[in-house]
Amino acid sequence: MIIPWQEIDQETLNNLMESIVLREGTDYGSQELSFETKVEQLKQRLKSGEAVIVYSELHESVDVVNKDSVTGNEPDGQ
Protein backbone atom coordinates (compact mmCIF):
# COMPACT_ATOMS: atom_id res chain seq x y z
CA MET A 1 0.00 0.00 0.00
CA ILE A 2 1.40 3.42 -0.97
CA ILE A 3 1.39 5.98 1.84
CA PRO A 4 1.41 9.61 0.61
CA TRP A 5 4.37 11.32 2.29
CA GLN A 6 2.40 14.59 2.45
CA GLU A 7 -0.07 12.97 4.87
CA ILE A 8 2.62 11.98 7.39
CA ASP A 9 3.43 14.28 10.30
CA GLN A 10 6.76 16.04 9.66
CA GLU A 11 8.47 14.62 12.76
CA THR A 12 7.25 11.12 11.92
CA LEU A 13 8.48 11.52 8.34
CA ASN A 14 11.91 12.64 9.57
CA ASN A 15 12.12 9.66 11.94
CA LEU A 16 11.08 7.30 9.15
CA MET A 17 13.70 8.69 6.75
CA GLU A 18 16.41 8.40 9.40
CA SER A 19 15.39 4.83 10.19
CA ILE A 20 15.51 3.84 6.52
CA VAL A 21 18.93 5.42 6.02
CA LEU A 22 20.25 3.60 9.09
CA ARG A 23 18.87 0.30 7.74
CA GLU A 24 20.71 0.79 4.45
CA GLY A 25 24.06 0.46 6.20
CA THR A 26 27.39 1.67 4.88
CA ASP A 27 27.63 3.07 1.38
CA TYR A 28 30.88 2.03 -0.26
CA GLY A 29 30.38 4.28 -3.28
CA SER A 30 33.04 6.50 -4.75
CA GLN A 31 32.13 9.28 -2.31
CA GLU A 32 30.91 8.67 1.24
CA LEU A 33 27.89 10.84 2.09
CA SER A 34 26.97 12.11 5.54
CA PHE A 35 23.93 10.73 7.33
CA GLU A 36 22.16 14.09 6.98
CA THR A 37 22.86 14.21 3.24
CA LYS A 38 21.46 10.70 2.75
CA VAL A 39 18.29 11.62 4.68
CA GLU A 40 17.87 14.80 2.61
CA GLN A 41 18.39 12.91 -0.67
CA LEU A 42 15.73 10.39 0.35
CA LYS A 43 13.29 13.21 1.14
CA GLN A 44 14.02 14.84 -2.22
CA ARG A 45 13.28 11.56 -4.01
CA LEU A 46 9.87 11.51 -2.29
CA LYS A 47 9.13 15.16 -3.05
CA SER A 48 10.09 14.76 -6.71
CA GLY A 49 7.84 11.72 -7.09
CA GLU A 50 10.76 9.46 -7.97
CA ALA A 51 10.14 7.36 -4.86
CA VAL A 52 7.14 6.45 -2.70
CA ILE A 53 6.57 5.19 0.82
CA VAL A 54 5.07 1.72 0.91
CA TYR A 55 3.62 -0.25 3.78
CA SER A 56 3.75 -4.03 3.57
CA GLU A 57 0.92 -5.67 5.49
CA LEU A 58 2.60 -9.04 5.00
CA HIS A 59 5.88 -7.93 6.59
CA GLU A 60 4.35 -5.18 8.75
CA SER A 61 7.06 -2.82 7.56
CA VAL A 62 7.49 0.54 5.86
CA ASP A 63 10.03 1.30 3.16
CA VAL A 64 10.83 3.82 0.44
CA VAL A 65 11.06 2.36 -3.06
CA ASN A 66 11.30 3.62 -6.63
CA LYS A 67 7.86 4.60 -7.88
CA ASP A 68 8.35 2.49 -11.02
CA SER A 69 8.62 -0.67 -8.92
CA VAL A 70 5.07 -0.28 -7.56
CA THR A 71 3.26 1.49 -10.40
CA GLY A 72 0.33 -0.60 -11.53
CA ASN A 73 0.39 -2.77 -8.42
CA GLU A 74 -1.99 -0.57 -6.48
CA PRO A 75 -5.76 -1.12 -6.75
CA ASP A 76 -6.35 2.50 -7.76
CA GLY A 77 -3.59 2.46 -10.38
CA GLN A 78 -1.08 4.51 -8.38
Curated annotation (Swiss-Prot):
Superkingdom of this protein's organism: Bacteria
Residue runs in coiled coils: none
InterPro entries to which the protein is assigned, alphabetical: UPF0270, YehU-like_sf
Chain segments annotated as transmembrane: none
Family that this chain belongs to: Belongs to the UPF0270 family.
The protein's name in its UniProt record: UPF0270 protein IL0325
Natural source organism: Idiomarina loihiensis (strain ATCC BAA-735 / DSM 15497 / L2-TR)
